[in-house]
A protein has these predicted regions:
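Short, basic, glycine/proline-bearing loop/turn elements
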Residues: 84-96, 218-222, 254-263
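N-terminal helical capping/dimerization or prosegment-like subdomains
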Residues: 10, 14-26
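Short, solvent-exposed loop/turn and secondary-structure capping segments
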Residues: 28-29, 64-69, 129-132, 261
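Divalent metal-coordination and catalytic microenvironments
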Residues: 21, 47, 58, 110, ...
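Polyanionic/metal-chelating signatures
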Residues: 102-225
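Active-site-adjacent C-terminal substructures of enzyme catalytic domains
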Residues: 97, 107, 116, 120-132, ...
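Single conserved hydrophobic/aromatic residue that forms the stacking wall/gate
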Residues: 1-8, 12-13
Length: 292
């Protein structure tokens, strides 16, 4: 158990008592005093505040301690989609839980800064990612109790315009995704769960036109729990996203590195609205991600 002295002086202190992960008392010192056993840890915050821990998403946190050093990273899976369209669908689907690297410098800094958990998927080059996991940034190994909060969170896919003639077109990528949802490959537990709506399908794309096509895909497969991860312009399809009940994950701030992001609302003073403001006004469920 832990007792936190929140505000006030020695004559008037408000206490917050926590036991087994729950708040058991928030009141004046003399009210909570009887609920605090002698062995409880007492911390005086000197006018500070207590906030719930943050959950990070979108970085390589937990999967790479030094991104530029291969020996300190889980690595990236190369895509075979460029040469053999269906070969990627037959390979094993990686799980982020199997690539977690605990105790690194980045994780320690994140944990000390209030990021207590993270949700990340395996890094990949190509269309197909893997299964993300929700883990504790302060854990030492996967053997620690509650080090992995949820082993299998969602299946991740990326849709992007081809960068050379050897990559499949965006239309081909969408056709393949539609085929996988309609007829999951035999033996693919992951795609069967996604097609039945048991797992979320997180699709990363920065193109507004692709987002519109994903809305049509959701109408075709209403049982699929689709989530869009995008740094592109979403304000023009905000109403459609809300009507289709499609949550989105967006970065708090975007520097427009790609042509696909050119239509974004910059925000004040250039525009009265921001992408986030328009999405929230239309009732879209929005999550904030890290942009690396």
């Amino acid at each position: 158990e832990i007792r936190l002295s929140l505000v006030g002086s020695e004559m008037c202190i408000r206490d917050s008592v926590y036991a087994n992960g729950r708040v058991t008392c928030v009141d004046a010192y003399h009210v909570c005093h009887d609920q605090v056993p002698p062995h409880a840890l007492s911390v005086h915050l000197h006018g500070g505040t207590v906030l719930p821990g943050l959950t990070s998403y979108g970085s390589t946190l937990g999967l790479s301690d030094v991104p530029s050093e291969s020996s300190a990273s889980n690595g990236q899976d190369p895509s075979l989609l460029t040469r053999h369209l269906y070969l990627d669908t037959k390979r094993l689907v990686p799980r982020a839980e199997d690539g977690l690297i605990f105790g690194g410098h980045a994780l320690r800094r994140a944990h000390a800064s209030g990021v207590t958990t993270a949700v990340n998927a395996p890094a990949t080059i190509g269309m197909f990612g893997g299964v993300s996991t929700h883990f504790d940034t302060g854990a030492r190994t996967v053997l620690d109790a509650h080090s992995v909060r949820t082993s299998e969170v969602a299946l991740h896919v990326r849709l992007a315009y081809p960068i050379d003639d050897h990559e499949p077109s965006l239309a081909t990528q969408l056709a393949l995704l539609r085929s996988l949802l309609r007829n999951p490959p035999p033996g693919s537990v992951e795609w069967h769960r996604v097609s039945r709506g048991e797992w979320p399908l997180v699709v990363k794309t920065d193109a507004q036109d692709t987002v519109a096509k994903l809305i049509l895909l959701k109408r075709t497969f209403p049982q699929v729990h689709l989530i869009i991860d995008s740094a592109g312009a979403l304000h023009e399809v905000a109403k459609d996203l809300a009507e289709a009940h499609i949550p989105v994950i967006v970065p708090a701030k975007v520097w427009e590195y790609g042509w696909e992001q050119r239509g974004r609302k910059e925000g004040p003073p250039l525009t009265a609205d921001t992408e986030l403001g328009v999405l929230l006004r239309h009732g879209v469920e929005v999550g904030i991600r890290i942009q690396e």
